[in-house]
Amino acid sequence: METRPSSSSSLSPATNLNLDRLKVLKLLGKGATGTVFLVHDSVSDSSVSSPFALKLVDKSSASSLRRARWEIQILRRLSDDTNPNPFLPKLLASSESSEFIAWALPYCSGGDLNVLRQRQNDGVFSSSVIKFYLAEIVCALDHLHTMGIAYRDLKPENILLQESGHVTLTDFDLSCSLNKPTRPEFYHLSDPEPDPNPESNLSHNKKSLRIFRQKKKKTKSARVNPITRRRLSFSGGERSNSFVGTDEYISPEVIRGDGHDFAVDWWALGVLTYEMMYGETPFKGRNKKETFRNVLVKEPEFAGKPSDLTDLIRRLLVKDPTKRFGFWRGAAEIKEHAFFKGVRWELLTEVLRPPFIPLRDDGDLTGKVTEESGFGIKEYFEKLKTPPLPLPHECSENNPFVDF
């Protein structure tokens, strides 16, 4: 029997959330499967000293409900872990009514990595900033894989910044449980050795890449048929055949329907790193079909001088998952790459200072919320279901749409 995780929050994990007591401070986000609010408990936390994020899903959608329950199950596993990872979320509490299923998570006041990148000069991160965030993301993925969980939804929007400036992965509804494959401890990759050249000036990467692409020929065509599913037999490991993920981050093996395992996360890490470096993903096309074709046949394009960073990206974006960086020895291969030289992996949260520390929330919520502030969860959804009032109009014989 699963137990609820302990928490230092004002919430009591041993009991369900009482949605009637929760007051919404603001809407944090709204997606296809649910809505995320910043809330506080109006009874136990009337001064709003401990606001938290609440993800709420309407149970009218069977698919959304199934994914919500699965995400809560994954979050409970992460929270019950005897050795929790600082870059993965902690489930504070959950609740289910006849209409909704909801769960509470610590509030990450820094927003997501995509918004932060867009605020930078030229919309890209420097090499040192990329190294900081990648190191923490690699540790988070390593922890998930050790638990037999493939994340399958790595993208900037799902990487949140805690109040401390460190990252947290979010949204686990597309994740899956796999048995970790048995692979040789050491495996020699045929990819080129890391380039000794010093790293290029990343502030000019975006412009250089645009000029570089003008000289490139069009990629050859490839048949894309994501509907087809073929299950391959892989000794010592388990693979999933489900077609999930964000178009620009989906790996070649998923598009081909070959089945996939933890290597899809290392592919997505390569796409993420490329986007952090250049401000755009490497395989984006004019539509989904062209994007998938690019993923299958196109090689990533790099501007400027080769560097340890571009070498890391190239190794992660190998189309054959069995030759991809991280396939045989997991995160250990990636941590040993020259780009991460000098990183003290066991002391990430203690040694390195985050490059960006979130400012206090716009409204400085603590201690400034009155009894009338905020609105109830159910009140919010009732308003959504209320049809809008008709627009006022004048009765005129020239207006054929006027009802009498």
Swiss-Prot record:
Give the matching CDD domains: STKc_phototropin_like (cd05574)
Q: Which reaction does it catalyse?
A: L-seryl-[protein] + ATP = O-phospho-L-seryl-[protein] + ADP + H(+); L-threonyl-[protein] + ATP = O-phospho-L-threonyl-[protein] + ADP + H(+)
An annotated GO BP: protein trans-autophosphorylation
Q: Which residues form the Protein kinase domain?
A: 22-340
Q: What is its EC number?
A: 2.7.11.1
Q: Which domain of life is it from?
A: Eukaryota
A single Gene Ontology CC term: cytoplasm
Please tell me in which tissues this protein is expressed. Expressed in the epidermis and cortex of the transition zone of the root apex and developing flowers. Expressed in rosette leaves, stems and siliques.
Q: Does the keyword Kinase apply?
A: yes
Q: Entry's SUPFAM superfamilies?
A: Protein kinase-like (PK-like)
The active site annotation covers 153 (proton acceptor)
Which sites bind ATP? 28-36, 55
Q: Does the keyword Transcription regulation apply?
A: no
Q: Which SMART domains match?
A: S_TKc (SM00220)
Disordered as annotated region, ranges? 185-207
Positions of the AGC-kinase C-terminal domain: 341-404
Phenotype seen when the gene is deleted: Ectopic growth in filaments and petals, distortion of integument planar growth and aberrant embryogenesis and partial lethality in ucn-1 embryos. The double mutants ucn-2 and ucnl-5 are embryonic lethal.
Q: Which family does this protein fall into? A: Belongs to the protein kinase superfamily. AGC Ser/Thr protein kinase family.
What this chain does, per the entry, is described as: Regulates planar ovule integument development by suppressing aberrantly oriented growth. Maintains planar growth of integuments by repressing the developmental regulator and transcription factor KAN4 which is involved in the control of early integument growth and polarity. Restricts growth in stamen filaments, petals, and cotyledons.
Q: What is this protein called?
A: Serine/threonine-protein kinase UCN
Protein source organism: Arabidopsis thaliana (Mouse-ear cress)
